Amino acid sequence: MPVTVKVRRVGQRGPPLELPRYETDGAAGLDLRADEPVTLAPGERRLVPTGLALEIPPGHEGQVRPRSGLAVRHGVGMVNAPGTIDSDYRGEVGVVLVNHGQEPVTFARGDRIAQLVIGPVVRAELALVEDLASSGRGGGGFGSTGR
């Protein structure tokens, strides 16, 4: 079921870019675009502005996720993936990109740099206890189930 996310343009770095949209009927994410040109040297990370601020409905969040094509073709990913946009955040959405490749990568203003996925949030109530229920996995982590 669709939810309405209000969008405001911010930054005024040039003519308005098109609003994020789903590129296919089955797409989970809306494409976010760079609102200014940026070149990332190998190993460099940078916060890239999108020119958008959002009003996400209460009970929902936005997740900013990397685009797989950028990773495959250029070695570009996100430092904090996914990045979380809380429903009460009203500032400009930025994407922290990093170039893991061997060559500089340039994005023009308007290039697609990430995806925005809107989803529900479940808030937990924590209960402090003396013991936890046992499980088949126990305390094994960090690849322990792949032996």
Curated annotation (Swiss-Prot):
Entry's EC annotation: 3.6.1.23
SUPFAM superfamilies, sorted: dUTPase-like
Organism listed in the record: Anaeromyxobacter sp. (strain Fw109-5)
UniProt record similarity statement: Belongs to the dUTPase family.
Keyword Cell division: no
Intrachain disulfide bonds: none
Reaction it catalyzes: dUTP + H2O = dUMP + diphosphate + H(+)
Gene3D superfamilies, per database record: 2.70.40.10
Pathway it works in: Pyrimidine metabolism; dUMP biosynthesis; dUMP from dCTP (dUTP route): step 2/2
Gene field: dut
Xref: NCBIfam families: dut, PRK00601.1
A Gene Ontology BP annotation from the UniProt entry: dUMP biosynthetic process
Protein name as it appears in the record: Deoxyuridine 5'-triphosphate nucleotidohydrolase
Record's function text: This enzyme is involved in nucleotide metabolism: it produces dUMP, the immediate precursor of thymidine nucleotides and it decreases the intracellular concentration of dUTP so that uracil cannot be incorporated into DNA.
Keywords: Hydrolase, Magnesium, Metal-binding, Nucleotide metabolism
Cofactors required: Mg(2+)
Positions annotated to bind substrate: R67, S68, G69, N80, T84, I85, D86
GO terms assigned for molecular function: dUTP diphosphatase activity; magnesium ion binding
InterPro entries given in the database record: dUTPase, dUTPase-like, dUTPase-like_sf, dUTPase_trimeric
